[in-house]
Amino acid sequence: MSQIAGFDAAPASELRPRLLALTESPLWADQLLGERPYGDLEHLLDASDRIIRALPADQVDAALAGHPRIGERASGLDPEAAARSAREQAGMSRADPETASAMAEGNADYEARFGRIYLVAAAGRSAADLLAFLRERLRHDPETELDVVRGELARITRLRLAGDFGTSGQEAS
């Protein structure tokens, strides 16, 4: 049985905790489970994207609870989630002290402006790229930025879902 077939057939009570470990939005998890079956990975990923992009602000904020600040080590997460976060933010681990300091300052500015952590799909991006993206996003109005956060959350969740439920030969696109 493929992982997607298993996902489609498994009890919601078994899958919900796994989904919430990927993105801590109960509404997202419940809607994703409620729309089964998907049949293949791409349909699952597309549904996830659509649901996340429609989340109300409070559910976006709930989802952010499982994400550490960019450039900070994950604390309070289970070891698997902390390791995943470290892999996703690997570019920041190679940041020079000046860039790391600027990122910490930018994180504080972002949180003061928007009331939530700066979320970006960090996998594969350098520290300099992450900092430049942060500075660009600080110029957004709150509504535009919330849409950007939803898009970044969708990208991160897509990668995590593909990692957890993809079958060999299938990747997130």
Predicted regions mapped to residue ranges:
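Conserved catalytic/binding loops enriched for acidic/polar residues
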Residues: 118
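Long, amphipathic alpha-helical surface segments
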Residues: 127-173
